[in-house]
Amino acid sequence: DERLGLALHPFDLATNKVLAMAGRLEVRDWVDLLQTDASLQTLGLLVWAACGKDPGYNPTSLFAAIRRHHYSQEEVNMLDFEVDPPCAAELGVRWHDALQEAAAFFSLLPAERAGTCVLTESGALFNGSAQELATELEQNRIVFHKGHIRGAWPQIR
């Protein structure tokens, strides 16, 4: 597309960040994942889907690889923010909350669907709690979308 060029869907970017965080120690990956956990889809479901991009991981092993990271205020300050850098201690609290919530998702989801994107029946990214996911699964209102290597052109709506 001449106006937009090639673009990844935000979900693809987020799952790529999960995989990046498993393999390197970059504070920007941590900050980005905290933001996507809050704005796109919960960390547990991003981990669930991301393991489908790398057959060397399952949700539990990928989760273990990312949960070990922690960062200092000095490292956060080195990033370029439009405003003052966030407080690393507050980010750490958010990270531990996201990790605790993420772990609850893995026991609910069917193992044979690991590596898929968890969607609502209308095709939107599921964004509820683990308890809400349990209810949606019981009522067969969850769709598992297996990604593919191909991509899609961006659309302006």
For each predicted feature, which ranges?
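Compositionally biased terminal segments of proteins
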Residues: 1-157
